[in-house]
Amino acid sequence: MGTASGMPNFARAGSASPYKIKAGFVTAVYYGDAVRMWISGDDSSSAAGYITPWVNGDGAGGATKILVGIFLGCSYYSTSQKKTVYNNYYPGSDAAADVDCYVCDDPQSQWMVQAGSTACGFANIGTCVDVESTPVGNTTTGISGMHLTNTYTTTNTLPFKVVNLVTSPPGANGADITTGYNNVIVAFNNQQYKALLGV
């Protein structure tokens, strides 16, 4: 969407910073997935210093699980194709070595996301919210399946904060704030460049 202060042409808003997915990591990561740094106790196929997908409930698990940003794609040497491939998602296999991935981690960025099955209304603006990690993304398009949960609260370790609703054009899919799965604008809440604690 842009940033809280707008997005002039010279701004880095929406740009992606380089991160790594560990070689042999068995979980797919999709375009648009929320991601965080791996910590002890996570999937043993990854390790410290690498990113891992956000899972619903991570924000309630304590301050050590801190959002990094939004996954925007990756490149890796494919063992099946015998060449470097550029993909909007990581399939959870086929990488011969660590995967170069790109994450928008701009702490001022804002994002449009679907609400859960319960509509997100004006009364929810300013609240904190988690994301559902299921259903998983689409392997044909590589697009994330994540959407907001139905719980809007004051919990400060949750990854996102509701800042606005999409209400136009009237009648468009996602613009009806009385219907579930409407479109919502969120900002990073507990994010690595905003949080005081490290991982």
For the regions a protein language model found, what residue spans apply to each?
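Surface-exposed, low-hydrophobicity beta-strand/loop segments enriched in small/polar/acidic residues
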Residues: 1-199
